[in-house]
Amino acid sequence: MAQEADGIRLDQRHGKARVRVGRVWRHAHDGSHHFVEWNVSISLLSHCLSSYRLDDNSDIVATDTIKNTVYVKAKECGDRLSVEEFAILIGKHFCSFYPQVFTAIVNIIEKPWERVSIDGKPHLHGFKLGSENHTTEARVEKSGALNLTSGIGGLALLKTTQSGFERFVRDKYTILPETRERMLATEVNASWRYSYESVASIPTKGLYFSEKFMDVKKVLMDTFFGPPETGVYSPSVQRTLYLMGSAVLKRFADVSSIHLKMPNIHFLPVNLSTKENPSMVKFKDDVYLPTDEPHGSIEATLSRITSKL
């Protein structure tokens, strides 16, 4: 919300970024522990125009206070909760506790700590770090209105066949050959928006969003790879991206849109030759040079079209 004074319109926010917190929940019934590591960033939109115009900080919530609040709220959460639930909880607190705060935007990145298994048995308190992150952004209004997104960051996927690229624009700058056989590799960054429009409307089932995160991830991966025996052919990253996004929208009624960013990470064919040995290495879809730059950049947003009737 813009504020005006002295012929100037001011849009402002302040907060605390990269507040790192680890939380352990100990379960007495079986002796197991659950661990999460969160990187929390908070922005507050508030009525504090006087701090910009005058020597008056009376409406500013100190960023150190914002940081401390994250740890206090983490301590108060006696039961395990999802990263989305924690983001909403933090947002609700700032909007209700401080009269001058009308919007809280909470971004959290959850590191992928996974329980280890020893001799096939889940360890009660042992964890290893995985690859892709679980992300969320909750925008909470004082009125209770909510804009909630979840996401996956750094989901590296690769298939060694069932991919090609043909019939693209060819001109005097084009040297790329057409192919129906290539390796397809990408690092998926996805974010999807939920259709819940208020804090009161979110599901009450515990860890609902953690389960939904795993379900969305599975749909994305299943669509990318196809059946385990045969796979599925990809004529382009664009087509595969579209199929992945539309599969999520078809499967999950409470997801209103999804944004996918899928760089085309290249594995270049290796051919080596000399005068003495013209076939030192002759590429037969077997030896590649991995490279991650430059890479193709493909991204799109798919949104559900709702009837206006």
From Swiss-Prot:
Location of the protein in the cell: Peroxisome
GO function terms (MF aspect): urate oxidase activity
Acetylation among keywords: yes
Pathway per the UniProt entry: Purine metabolism; urate degradation; (S)-allantoin from urate: step 1/3
Keyword set includes Ligase: no
Annotated S-S bridges: none
PANTHER family xrefs: URICASE
Short motif Microbody targeting signal, span: 307-309
E.C. numbers: 1.7.3.3
Function summary: Catalyzes the oxidation of uric acid to 5-hydroxyisourate, which is further processed to form (S)-allantoin.
Entry's Gene Ontology cellular component terms: cytosol; peroxisome
PTM annotation (N-acetylalanine): residues: A2
Chain residues that bind urate: T63, D64, F165, R182, V237, Q238, N264
InterPro entries registered for this protein in UniProt: Uricase, Uricase_CS
Residues the record marks as active site: K16, T63, H266
Protein name: Uricase
Residue ranges crossing the lipid bilayer per the database entry: none
Cleavable signal peptide: none
UniProt source species: Arabidopsis thaliana (Mouse-ear cress)
Main location: other
